[in-house]
């Protein structure tokens, strides 16, 4: 009997969510995890009895905030003294300490204080992606391509490779997320001649713009721009603050100091934000949110877009900068790809399309 052919998987190790795909029968299949979701939260939690990764880790974050680690991608390959690390630390409920100048997260695991490097946390997420792929393929997975942001430094790229090795993966290349997106859409196979592509990727924690040229299957990144602290989380924060104020106005209670209530509200806001773009409004229903008070509230899509209008506008300058740096005019873009969660928001799509003024550019959406 012939041994199964070894397959390499592709892993998008994201700041807030990760996913794994495999190329079969001429197309990329993004695989569902054990919860039936094609994206898995990049969360790792430690309890008195076990370690949780993904959906299970995120779902208990409200009850266990100090030992639930996320945003490891913001730490990986960086020094503890980096200004971005020092700034981010102020917003995390878990503790970050320095060891030899490198950041480590400190948690309580099985009753003991433990510290982990960001690569170790990321390796736990990568292991979850590996398990997801193995469950689907029915065979061991040893090889993986892992994507990183174009702006990642050599040390960040190497640390990501190290995370893959810790997870038991032989990392083939580390490739830029923008290049991976262009390949996924088959833009390298779209007719003869050189094509210019703009990737507009609003992820959970970062916003990245890349301009690529594709010629005879060869990809060249012409320019990159973006904001490493603009992403879906910022849109979530607007919703959380809006509903916190609504709760205070309606019930005269301030829940801003209650971490569990805030985490439950944030989870409900994330769910509301993912309401299909065909819907005109989303509803929050949270039983006993704070001091026994139930909270039921709706928000229209128009109101959401009004709350976030400045965030949508702030995506414009990075696009213009990327085009300037690539020495290209809007009219010279043949294709543009809307990635991350942006494609579900009509205003987000309108911002990108309006800025490029289409000019016959073909628009693609993330699956």
Swiss-Prot record:
GO cellular component terms, semicolon-separated: blood microparticle; cytoplasm; cytosol; extracellular exosome; nucleus; plasma membrane
UniProt cross-references to Pfam families, sorted A to Z: HSP70
Source species of the chain: Homo sapiens (Human)
Family: Belongs to the heat shock protein 70 family.
Full protein name: Putative heat shock 70 kDa protein 7
Keywords carried by this UniProt record: ATP-binding, Nucleotide-binding, Stress response
GO MF terms held by the record: ATP binding; ATP hydrolysis activity; ATP-dependent protein folding chaperone; heat shock protein binding; protein folding chaperone
Entry keyword Nucleotidyltransferase: no
Biological process annotations from GO: chaperone cofactor-dependent protein refolding; protein refolding
Stretch forming the signal peptide: none
Cited InterPro entries: ATPase_NBD (IPR043129), Heat_shock_70_CS (IPR018181), Hsp_70_fam (IPR013126)
Glycoprotein listed as a keyword: no
């Amino acid at each position: 009997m012939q041994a199964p052919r070894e397959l390499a998987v592709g892993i998008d190790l994201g700041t807030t969510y990760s996913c794994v795909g495999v190329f079969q029968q001429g197309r990329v299949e993004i695989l569902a995890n054990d919860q039936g979701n094609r994206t898995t939260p990049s969360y790792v939690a430690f309890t008195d009895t076990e370690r949780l990764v993904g959906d299970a880790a995120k779902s208990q974050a409200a009850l266990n905030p100090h030992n639930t680690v996320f945003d490891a991608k913001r730490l990986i390959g960086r020094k503890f003294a980096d200004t971005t690390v020092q700034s981010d630390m102020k917003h995390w409920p878990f503790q970050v300490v320095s060891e030899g100048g490198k950041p480590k997260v400190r948690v309580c695991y099985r009753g003991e204080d433990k510290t982990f490097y960001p690569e170790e946390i990321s390796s736990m997420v990568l292991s979850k992606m590996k398990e997801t792929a193995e469950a689907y393929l029915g065979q061991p997975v040893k090889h993986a391509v892992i994507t990183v942001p174009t702006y990642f430094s050599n040390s960040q790229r190497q640390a990501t490779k190290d995370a893959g090795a810790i997870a038991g993966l032989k990392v083939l290349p580390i490739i830029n997320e923008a290049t991976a997106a262009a390949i996924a859409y088959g833009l390298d196979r779209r007719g003869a001649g050189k094509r210019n592509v703009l990737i507009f990727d609003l992820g959970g924690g970062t916003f990245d713009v890349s301009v690529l040229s594709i010629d005879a299957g060869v990809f060249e990144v012409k320019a990159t721009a973006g904001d490493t602290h603009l992403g879906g989380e910022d849109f979530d924060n607007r919703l959380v603050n809006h509903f916190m104020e609504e709760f205070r106005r309606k019930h005269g209670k301030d829940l801003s100091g209650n971490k569990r209530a805030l985490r439950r509200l944030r989870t409900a806001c994330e769910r509301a934000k993912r309401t299909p773009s065909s819907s005109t409004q989303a509803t929050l229903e949270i039983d006993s949110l704070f001091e026994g008070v139930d909270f039921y509230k709706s928000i229209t899509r128009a109101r959401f877009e009004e709350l976030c209008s400045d965030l949508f506008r702030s995506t414009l300058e990075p696009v213009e900068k990327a085009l300037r740096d690539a020495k290209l005019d809007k009219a010279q873009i043949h294709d543009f790809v809307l990635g991350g969660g942006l494609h579900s928001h009509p205003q987000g799509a309108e911002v990108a399309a309006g800025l490029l003024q289409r000019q016959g550019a073909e628009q693609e959406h993330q699956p």
